[in-house]
């Protein structure tokens, strides 16, 4: 019983430490979850024990990306305990850089078309994710006061890394938001709320996933919130938008994170060159 109480105290203090470090609520939730599992199994705050824990998770089928997240959580915990040398000994596993999967513009259109006209909230969720490149957590945390209707901007509060950013809203999307709000009858400060709950809590990421899964099935498309974000970036790049602007819109701290989309469009560029067929009359007969 005493051990359980001590663990709770450590987790609470660790969460406070992460908050002071500027970590987002989602990061704090994940880090404390993995630390609780680490402590529950009786591991000590050493790199050696951390490796044993990671090996156990890998054997359970955890992906390299998930393992990487656990490493980040444990490194933060070691630093919290003042064990900087142990933190340094932990190495992040190499994550293979895979091309993000994005929908085609035709698939996005098909997805929107299967949403019933009376499901105004659901339609707006899809339009916002695709039309602004928001992360699902950012969408759920969006408040009505974060939207500047006069100037046509929305402000993302405390995005990844705890940074705010401003995103322009296209006029058609702004009109959709106004139409949606005119039909709202609750007084929640959040732009999106749960429709099935009496107290109208803010929308959860789980609900967004469920909504997309439902309409994706109807459209015959596998779609996730992150895929819509990828699609936003890819389609912007394909239309000639500067990659640095896309970086700002996505809220990427590093340009290298955004540059993966230049690889996504390689196929698109190849097809364009082949369609142009500039050399047909020059070497076609050889």
Curated annotation (Swiss-Prot):
The catalytic site is made up of: 135, 160, 226, 229, 252, 261 (o-(3'-phospho-dna)-tyrosine intermediate)
Give TM segment ranges: none
Write the record's keywords in alphabetical order, separated by commas. Answer: Cytoplasm, DNA integration, DNA recombination, DNA-binding
Q: Where does the Tyr recombinase domain start and stop, copy by copy?
A: 98-274
- Quick one: a GO biological-process term for this protein? DNA transposition
Q: Which residues form the Core-binding (CB) domain?
A: 5-82
Q: What is its main location?
A: cytoplasm
Subcellular location(s): the record lists: Cytoplasm
| GO MF term (any one) | DNA binding
What HAMAP family does the database record attribute to this sequence? Recomb_XerA
| Protein function | Site-specific tyrosine recombinase, which acts by catalyzing the cutting and rejoining of the recombining DNA molecules.
Against PANTHER family, the record matches this protein to: INTEGRASE_RECOMBINASE PROTEIN MJ0367-RELATED (PTHR30349:SF41), PHAGE INTEGRASE-RELATED (PTHR30349)
Family that this chain belongs to = Belongs to the 'phage' integrase family. XerA subfamily.
Name of the molecule in the record: Tyrosine recombinase XerA
Organism of origin is Pyrococcus furiosus (strain ATCC 43587 / DSM 3638 / JCM 8422 / Vc1)
UniProt lineage: Archaea, Methanobacteriati, Methanobacteriota, Thermococci, Thermococcales
Q: State which gene encodes it.
A: xerA
């Amino acid at each position: 019983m005493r051990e359980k109480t001590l663990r709770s105290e450590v987790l609470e203090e660790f969460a406070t430490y992460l908050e002071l470090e500027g970590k987002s609520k989602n990061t704090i939730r994940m880090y404390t979850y993995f630390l609780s599992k680490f402590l529950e199994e009786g591991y000590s705050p050493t790199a050696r024990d951390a490796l044993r824990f990671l090996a156990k998770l890998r054997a359970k089928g955890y992906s390299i990306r998930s393992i990487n997240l656990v490493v980040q959580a444990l490194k933060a915990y070691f630093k919290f305990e003042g064990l900087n040398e142990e933190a340094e000994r932990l190495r992040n596993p190499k994550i293979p850089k895979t091309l993000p999967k994005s929908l085609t513009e035709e698939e996005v259109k098909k997805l929107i078309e299967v949403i019933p006209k009376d499901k105004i909230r659901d339609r707006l969720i899809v339009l916002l994710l695709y039309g602004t490149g928001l992360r699902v957590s950012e969408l759920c945390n969006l408040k009505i006061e974060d939207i500047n209707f006069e100037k046509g901007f929305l402000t993302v509060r405390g995005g990844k890394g705890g940074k705010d950013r401003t995103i322009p809203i296209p006029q058609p999307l702004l009109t959709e938001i106004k139409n949606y709000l005119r039909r709202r009858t609750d007084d929640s400060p959040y732009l999106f709320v749960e429709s099935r709950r009496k107290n109208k809590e803010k929308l959860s990421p789980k609900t967004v996933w469920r909504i997309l899964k439902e309409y994706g099935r109807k459209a015959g498309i596998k779609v996730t919130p992150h895929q819509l974000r990828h699609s936003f970036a890819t389609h912007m790049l394909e239309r000639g938008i500067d990659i640095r602007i896309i970086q700002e819109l996505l809220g990427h701290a590093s340009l290298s994170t955004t540059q993966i989309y230049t690889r996504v469009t390689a196929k698109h560029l190849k097809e364009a060159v082949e369609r142009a067929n500039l050399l047909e009359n020059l070497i076609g007969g050889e």
